[in-house]
Amino acid sequence: MQIAWALAVGGVVLVLAPKQGWWWLALAIVTGIELLAAWGRRQIVSQLMIPVVMAACVVLVMTLVPRLASQISLALVYIVWRWWWSTGEAGRANLPNLLVLQTMISLAVFLMAVVWRVPSWFAELLMWGLSYTTVLTVMSTRREQSARLLAASWALIVTQLTWLLQIWLFTYTVQGGYVMIPQGVLVITAMGYCFGSIYMSARAGSLSRGRLMEFLAIGIVIIIMVVSGTSWKGAI
């Protein structure tokens, strides 16, 4: 049954999302399937929110990337994730899952900015809303007392990064367009790893100087990547 739900959702995404202008229909059908899957369960909102956000991001990314091979690969990854999500609560509230969610949110938002040229304020609003919702849901699952504060703080950070990185919008593209990764996706994912790891380590009482140096090194790499990999044609 669990794999059936995953295949059903993944099949809808793969068939409809790549078709020009059909992304809204794919999103509506997937939302209906997820609502049916979560119906009658306890905490239906938390059961429904993360799969719908993930599905929406996958639909948008598949609509925006031009190559069928990339779309099929993304659909297969999504099917595996959806099957894993349906297997139970274990692991859902961990840092890797939250990083995957944030990466997909960032990829969808920045590709919309690159391909559809959506207004900057819309991209920032979308990034804030989706980031806040996912972090709040995951942290509430962990029964964090400061879940709202943590979610709002992280949403503010990624919104500010989205504003800044849209000024010099830069995309890493493999020849042929098989892979399109906006620079903002890498920066936000790396920042999420650093902040998330610091928080999780501090909560577990295992934060050390060595770990802090690791995060500092990642931060330096991010700065070098932004400085060296950007065309710097924009203006504040």
What is each of the regions a protein language model found here?
Residues 63-64, 108-120, 159-175, 222-236:
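Hydrophobic alpha-helical transmembrane segments in multi-pass integral membrane proteins
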Residues 1-88, 204-236:
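N-terminal topogenic module of multi-pass integral membrane proteins
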Residues 167-190:
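Short alpha-helical packing/oligomerization segments
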Residues 69-76, 84-164:
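Membrane-proximal helix-loop-helix units in multi-pass membrane proteins
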